[in-house]
Design a protein with these regions (language model features):
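Short beta-strand segments
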Residues: 1-2, 139
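C-terminal substrate-binding/catalytic lobe of Rossmann-fold NAD(P)-dependent oxidoreductases
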Residues: 3-134
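Glycine-rich phosphate/pyrophosphate-binding beta-alpha loops
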Residues: 57-61, 139-146
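Internal hydrophobic alpha-helix adjacent to the cofactor/substrate pocket in enzyme cavities
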Residues: 148-160
Length: 160
């Protein structure tokens, strides 16, 4: 994950048990750990132990991007097939309104306050080794997307 810095990071160089986390967030790209890959295994048990990841905190005030490399179950994969599967999932079914599909050449600030939890960037789909491995990217406004999911949850509870 390439992640915008957050409020728990230092604004000036200071002391921290992790020397990298001690550095000024707005001035540095900071490699660090992430709990996101482990969290996926909690939500999707069949993926437990099959994902790992790292995070680089970057000096942007908001919006992050996930770069995910995976080995497709059907090889060789094509970028068109991968993109179409994501596009279809964004238009119908349980991910409608949560996953968005984008083909415009946008940058991080363009996704600020996007209500979706994930905005798939079809322009960044890359095939490696003739489609034996695929890299995809998806943008997100961490706080705003999460807040919208909490509003969805509150509305669901209110309808019970």
């Amino acid at each position: 994950t390439i992640h915008s810095y957050t409020g728990d990071q230092r604004t000036v160089d200071t002391l921290h048990k992790d020397p990298r986390r001690a550095r000024a967030a707005a001035l540095n790209m900071i490699p660090t750990s992430t709990g996101a890959a482990k969290a996926v295994g909690l939500v999707l048990p069949h993926l437990k132990g099959k994902l790992d990841g790292t995070s680089i905190r970057v000096p942007t005030p908001n919006v992050s991007v996930v770069s995910l490399d995976f080995v497709p179950t059907r090889t060789p994969a094509s970028a068109e097939a991968v993109n179409e599967a994501i596009r279809a999932a964004s238009l119908e079914g349980p991910l409608k309104g949560i996953l968005e599909y984008n083909t415009a050449p946008l940058v991080s600030s363009d996704f600020n306050h996007d209500k979706a939890s994930s905005i798939f960037d079809a322009t960044q789909t890359v095939l490696v080794d003739g489609g034996k491995m695929v890299r995809v990217c998806s943008w997100y406004d961490n706080e705003w997307g999460f807040s919208n999911r909490m509003a969805d949850t509150a509305a669901l509870f209110g309808s019970l």
